[in-house]
């Protein structure tokens, strides 16, 4: 495989500013990979798949043992499992649906995809004093079901279902997004498009319309909004997002109703216009109590393409009508809908440069953002297997690029998590060696010229350069309608 040459492994590490620990990531065709801050691989659970993988106290790992044949399905994991440090299965759930695909033995499957949460921790990453249970407790799982619902489409649909199971594997609660179609706020144009083409995938079991594609699901946990009396934010309520629909919402667990939502149309209110259109987002969750920014909504706004609406020159069938060629991290106050923090590649860049620089942080698919105890944010730019940690002031203090390997060429990282060292008592704390940032202006690989300018010839009639260089678009043509001088974060659209 040919690719541009760039360093892999850990490329930046400032131990004084980073929140150090182990980073867990799922690597396709390899398994669950645990690294230290210098990129040393300290553990690989071979072939233990992660959609995503999560680390539990005591060196336990969660993920799945297999995946359904994709000729008959779309992104169905066979189960959700918990293994110990030595790879022994200590818990597994698969008895949701008996699958009988042609040419395969009948098999019970969970049809899990994209997310799950173990009781004790609302989000699955490290939160002080909120540890996932390892020998008991319920597990909330995001699953698929194949359905027909003619209120949505006359096509076969791949529906998203939240399933809560106890330690013994009994299903104790379920919620289906298709049963709340009228609550989702689709325009009539979007409904017409959905009926004709609900984002169809073709399998040997027929067409599957992945109409919502929910890719994140977590409980809210204890939070200040509920403490102040806002029932929408009950700790048991579930926050989720749907990438195909550009929707982020909270489901009331007791009633099943959707009680909070932004999207799909970000022109609907003044507050949403200031946020700007969110497209194809991932990992929308509430920052848990005990972490900086607690109570705010954190998400990876991918950009790329998503959404349903009127057909146009870019989308002749009305699917994937919203397009943007860069990504953003957004932290949003869920009550005021104000963006209180954001990250793009062009932060602190002015003039024409944001349009150019922004594309250097861009993952059209997958990806995530985790708030760390010191206020930093761990970002997974999944399509390019880049994981990096930024401070509140947008300084990159740790960066890692997963190396390409023969086992997993062109890999991506769905979602990475940072955990404290004491989650793995089987290992001694590793040495933390600073990795200085390369000076990219002067760095050269062996054999390359030093890059110094030389051999000048003066052109007597040349008049030199003006102070400003013209580009194809001028900065006064940039749409900055999302900018508000009273906002803490301005120009969030870019």
Across the structure, where does each feature detected by a protein language model lie?
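Histidine-/acidic-rich catalytic cores in large beta-rich domains
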Residues: 1-494
């Amino acid at each position: 495989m040919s690719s541009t040459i760039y360093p892999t492994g850990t490329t930046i590490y400032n131990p004084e500013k980073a929140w150090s620990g182990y980073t867990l990531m799922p690597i396709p065709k390899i398994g669950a990979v645990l690294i230290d801050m210098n990129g040393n691989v300290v553990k690989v659970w071979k072939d233990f798949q992660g959609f995503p993988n999560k680390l539990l106290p005591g060196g336990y790992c969660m993920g799945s043992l297999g995946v359904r044949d994709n000729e008959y399905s779309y992104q169905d994991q066979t189960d959700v499992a918990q293994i110990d440090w030595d790879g022994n299965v200590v818990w597994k759930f698969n008895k949701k649906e008996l699958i009988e695909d042609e040419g395969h033995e009948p098999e019970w499957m969970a049809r899990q995809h994209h997310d799950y949460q173990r009781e004790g921790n609302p989000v699955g990453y490290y939160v002080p004093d909120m540890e996932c249970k390892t020998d008991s407790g319920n597990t909330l799982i995001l699953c698929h079901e194949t359905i027909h619902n003619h209120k949505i489409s006359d096509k076969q649909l791949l529906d998203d279902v939240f399933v809560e199971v106890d330690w013994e594997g009994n299903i104790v609660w379920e919620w289906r997004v298709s049963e709340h179609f009228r609550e989702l706020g689709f325009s009539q144009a979007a409904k017409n498009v959905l009926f004709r083409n609900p984002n169809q995938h073709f399998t040997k079991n027929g067409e599957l319309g992945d109409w919502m594609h929910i890719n994140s699901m977590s409980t809210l946990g204890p939070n200040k909004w509920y403490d102040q009396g806002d029932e929408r934010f009950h700790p048991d309520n579930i926050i989720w997002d749907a990438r195909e629909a550009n929707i982020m919402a909270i489901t009331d667990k007791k009633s099943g109703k959707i009680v909070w939502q932004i999207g799909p149309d970000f022109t609907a209110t003044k507050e949403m216009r200031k946020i700007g259109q969110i497209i194809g987002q991932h990992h929308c969750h509430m920052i848990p109590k005990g972490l900086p920014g607690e109570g705010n909504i954190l998400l990876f706004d991918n950009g790329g393409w998503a959404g349903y609406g009127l057909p146009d020159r870019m989308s002749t069938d009305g699917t994937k009508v919203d397009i943007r060629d860069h990504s953003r991290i957004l932290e949003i106050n869920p009550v005021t809908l104000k963006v209180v923090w954001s990250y793009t590649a062009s932060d602190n860049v002015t003039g024409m440069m944001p349009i150019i620089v922004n594309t250097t942080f861009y993952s059209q698919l997958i990806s995530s953002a985790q708030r760390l105890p010191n206020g930093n944010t761990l970002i997974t730019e999944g399509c390019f297997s880049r994981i990096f940690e930024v401070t509140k002031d947008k300084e990159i203090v740790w960066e890692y690029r997963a190396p390409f390997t023969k086992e997993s060429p062109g890999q991506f990282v769905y979602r990475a998590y940072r955990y404290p060292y004491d989650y793995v008592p089987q290992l001694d704390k590793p040495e933390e060696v600073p990795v200085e940032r390369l000076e990219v202006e002067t760095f050269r690989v062996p054999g390359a010229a030093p890059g110094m300018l030389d051999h000048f010839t003066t052109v007597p009639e040349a008049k030199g350069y003006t102070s400003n260089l013209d580009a194809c678009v001028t900065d006064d043509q940039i749409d900055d309608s999302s900018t508000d001088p009273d906002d803490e974060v301005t120009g969030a659209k870019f």
